[in-house]
Curated annotation (Swiss-Prot):
Name of the protein: Hemoglobin subunit beta
Species of the source: Aptenodytes forsteri (Emperor penguin)
Keyword DNA-binding recorded: no
GO cellular component, one term: blood microparticle
PANTHER family: HEMOGLOBIN FAMILY MEMBER, HEMOGLOBIN SUBUNIT EPSILON
InterPro entries the UniProt entry points to: Globin (IPR000971), Globin-like_sf (IPR009050), Globin/Proto (IPR012292), Hemoglobin_b (IPR002337), Hemoglobin_oxygen_transport (IPR050056)
Gene designation per UniProt: HBB
Tissue expression notes: Red blood cells.
Subunit structure: Heterotetramer of two alpha chains and two beta chains.
């Protein structure tokens, strides 16, 4: 994947403003609420019986932060995303058996969360760069499945 200097600047500039705990918790909660079938991968998280329960669940918040912290690794390693996510791809494929489509869904939700939090900075050019990044990350996470 080729990244232009402008794309890199837009992504790193936006990412520098992201609160990974807050945005990560919101993104994962939205995934579990909007696509409830994804909850089956989080059975150990306890009560996910309603949107309010998902939003209040401390394990959802903690894992959302973990997910977005890992996503930050993609921002730091934009020229080597495939290798950055090699171990996570193996984990999600071989041990957790996560449907790789879920990576795309989470990426789309992350775009919504970023747009909601950073509306002034989230220009069409920024959105295009961010969308490209979430697609590349989703592809890297799904790599072990191919």
């Amino acid at each position: 994947v080729h990244w232009s200097a402008e794309e890199k600047q837009l992504i790193t500039g936006l990412w520098g403003k992201v609160n990974v705990a807050e945005c990560g918790a919101e993104a994962l909660a939205r995934l579990l609420i909007v696509y409830p079938w994804t909850q089956r991968f989080f059975a150990s998280f306890g009560n996910l019986s309603s949107p309010a329960a998902v939003l209040a669940n401390p394990m959802v918040r903690a894992h959302g932060k973990k997910v977005l912290t890992s996503f930050g690794d993609a921002v730091k390693n934009m020229d080597n995303i495939k290798n950055t996510f090699a171990q996570l791809s193996e984990l999600h494929c071989d041990k957790l058996h996560v449907d790789p489509e879920n990576f795309r869904l989470l990426g789309d939700i992350l775009i919504i969360v970023l747009a909601a939090h950073f509306s002034k900075d989230f220009t069409p050019d920024c959105q295009a760069a961010a969308q490209k990044l979430v697609r590349v990350v989703a592809h890297a996470l799904a790599r072990k499945y191919h």
